[in-house]
Regions:
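A short, Lys/Arg-enriched amphipathic alpha-helix followed by its capping loop at the start of a domain
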Residues: 71-78
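N-terminal [4Fe-4S]-dependent radical SAM core
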Residues: 1-41, 246, 256
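Radical SAM enzyme [4Fe-4S]-AdoMet core and its adjacent flexible, acidic
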Residues: 133-284
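Canonical Radical SAM [4Fe-4S] cluster-binding loop centered on the CxxxCxxC motif
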Residues: 28-68
Length: 299
């Protein structure tokens, strides 16, 4: 397995491998970072798909972030990870020069696209992979088909994103056994996600209940199954793991090692689901933003 990079952060060392594995090592009892290991960054609010549960509220009229001119980009540390989403990141006119700039500074970039964006922009995405402008590729599932499984399988570092409450039991069952990587996201009750939940509450709760009861029957049938922190809470993941397993696999609470940046509205917060009154104006330093988020957490 290829080592992408190693760096020291506070009282511990981090090793990043080409398959997405992250290894933290310390001689102390806890990991105390000096800077964020990773950031979830929104590049654009433009998207033509109109998903009814989109917590970002993206639209065809949505604006792009001014991604080439934000000062904090020049304060990123080598081998920090940045996960770019939207909106439709492939629609941003400055995406390639932006990613090239990050590559020159040894920043590990990942993007998330929708299933249909993967189909429509496959050549662009393949180019980003071939030029090592991105390493991780998240693909949000819309409708499970054989074509989807076949297309995703062509990208070794692709991870299928599904939403707890939206993904159907039969989709989990059909994806199992294909050596796929799966990320389960918690259902976000924000923007269009709120209105969708009101209209489809019974079905969403039914899907959530199935996931909580049956998911663990299928975990071994995927190459990897991971969760965001909201899904960990909604699915009570900790209850299904031993203390040793939890300590090995849990990567930390929101704002402990990560935070969220919205380059469209020029704001940052502990996560993309943070209340609107807990989002702050963008600063010129990524470390200053992380420090502010951490201070708020401990207040």
């Amino acid at each position: 397995m290829k080592v992408l990079g190693r760096y020291k952060n506070g009282n511990y060392d981090v090793t990043l491998l080409s398959d997405g594995t992250k290894i933290r090592e310390t001689e102390d009892d806890e990991f105390i970072p000096d800077f964020a290991e990773s950031m979830d960054i929104k590049l654009t609010n433009h998207c033509s798909l109109g998903c009814p549960y989109c917590h970002e509220g993206s639209t065809p009229e949505g604006e792009h972030g001014d991604i080439l001119n934000e000062k904090f980009i020049d304060t990123l540390h080598p081998y920090q990870e940045v996960a770019f989403g939207g909106g439709d990141v492939t629609s941003h006119p400055d995406l390639i020069p932006f990613l090239r700039r990050l590559k020159e500074r040894h920043i590990i970039a990942n993007i998330t696209v929708n299933q249909y964006q993967l189909y429509n922009e496959k050549e662009l995405i393949q180019r980003l992979v071939d030029e090592q402008l991105i390493y991780g590729l998240g693909v949000s599932l819309m409708v499970l088909t054989d074509e989807f499984i076949e297309t995703v399988s062509q990208f070794p570092n692709a991870v299928i994103h599904v939403i707890n409450g939206i993904v159907l039991p039969e989709e989990i069952e059909e994806m199992a056994g294909h050596n796929l990587k799966l990320l389960i996201l918690g259902y976000k009750e924000l923007r269009r996600g709120n209105s969708f939940l009101r209209e489809h509450l019974e079905q969403v709760e039914k899907n959530k209940a199935w996931m909580k009861e049956h998911l663990w029957e299928y975990v071994s049938k995927f190459a990897v199954v991971s969760f965001d922190n909201l899904a960990i809470e909604q699915l009570d993941v900790k209850n299904y793991l031993s203390e040793e397993e939890w300590n090995e696999f849990f990567m930390g609470d929101d704002s402990e090692f990560t935070y969220y940046i919205d380059m469209v509205n020029r704001q940052f917060a502990k996560s993309s689901t943070a209340p609107f009154d807990e989002r702050y104006p963008l600063m010129d330093s990524c470390d200053d933003m992380f420090e502010k988020i951490r201070k708020r957490k401990h207040e």
